[in-house]
Swiss-Prot record:
SUPFAM superfamilies: HAD-like. This is Phosphoglycolate phosphatase. It comes from Rhodospirillum rubrum (strain ATCC 11170 / ATH 1.1.1 / DSM 467 / LMG 4362 / NCIMB 8255 / S1). Specifically catalyzes the dephosphorylation of 2-phosphoglycolate. Is involved in the dissimilation of the intracellular 2-phosphoglycolate formed during the DNA repair of 3'-phosphoglycolate ends, a major class of DNA lesions induced by oxidative stress. InterPro entries: HAD-like_hydrolase_sf (IPR050155), HAD-like_sf (IPR036412), HAD-SF_hydro_IA (IPR006439), HAD_sf (IPR023214), PGP-like_dom2 (IPR023198), PGPase_prok (IPR037512). Gene3D superfamilies: HAD superfamily/HAD-like, Putative phosphatase, domain 2.
Length: 241
């Protein structure tokens, strides 16, 4: 049984795509650019707000999709955050079963954290507003350190904060970024199938792929009575018990 479980936020605990899409489209509209639909934005998220903005404008031939640090992208990022940060709860919802599993884990003394590329302020506001903050012991966001995922530094900082070693923790994410981060930090990792991955989740090399939190709870040894179970696809036969 892991001593700590560390979750990604967007696409793992929380469906935040509507609010991200709305803020991004407001930013695009300021430059007289057409709005993007949620399917397009979904393919752009996962590596921080800077790259989200860079990818959105690159779709219109403005800047490079892989460069979040140039002057123009930084200015666009500031405008995006001005739209998003005041109300990160807009259109956001908790994935079914997430709160129940967090509560069950915390009740058994499992230390919980969130490691996200979302800026720390909006991330904490989102957790608080959606009722997820109480069991979460710490949050490391995309601007907490100089590095962000897939660099292992944010995850390692969270391990230190929670007081656990890498092999005593489990990372739960939804994307190649989460898997790469966990592997670089030496943390076992599983992924949720419903999130914002741009690649097939079965190909990411995680220990297991879960379709819902009830199935993840079963695997962890915390079954949720009455929870909807869509299934799990283990990549390995063992569980962390």
């Amino acid at each position: 049984m892991p001593k700590a479980v560390i979750f990604d936020l967007d696409g793992t605990l929380v469906h935040s795509l509507p609010g991200l899409t709305d803020a991004l489209n407001k930013t695009l509209a300021e430059d007289d650019l057409a709005p993007l639909d949620e399917a397009a934005v979904k393919r752009m998220v996962g590596e921080g707000a800077g790259l989200l903005v860079a990818r959105a404008f690159a779709a219109y031939g403005l800047g490079r999709a892989d460069d979040a640090d140039d002057t123009a992208t930084q200015a666009r990022l500031a405008r995006f955050l001005a739209h998003y940060a005041p109300d990160p709860l807009a259109g956001a919802s908790v994935y079914p079963g997430a709160l129940a599993l967090l509560g069950a884990l915390a009740a058994r003394g499992i230390r919980l954290g969130v490691c996200t590329n979302k800026p720390e302020g909006p991330a904490r506001a989102l957790l608080e507003g959606l009722g997820l903050a109480d069991p979460i012991m710490d949050v490391v966001g995309g601007d907490t350190l100089a590095q962000r995922k897939p660099d292992p530094a944010p995850l390692r900082a969270l391990l230190d904060s929670l007081g656990v070693e890498a092999d005593q923790a489990l990372m739960v994410g939804d994307s190649p970024t989460d898997v790469a981060t966990a592997k670089a930090a030496g943390v076992p990792v599983v992924v949720m199938s419903y999130g914002y991955s741009r690649e097939p989740v079965a190909s990411l090399g995680a220990l297991a792929v879960f379709d819902d939190f009830a199935s993840l709870g079963d695997w962890l040894g915390f079954p949720q009575p009455g929870g909807d179970r869509l299934g799990a696809t283990p990549a390995l036969s063992e569980n962390p018990a």
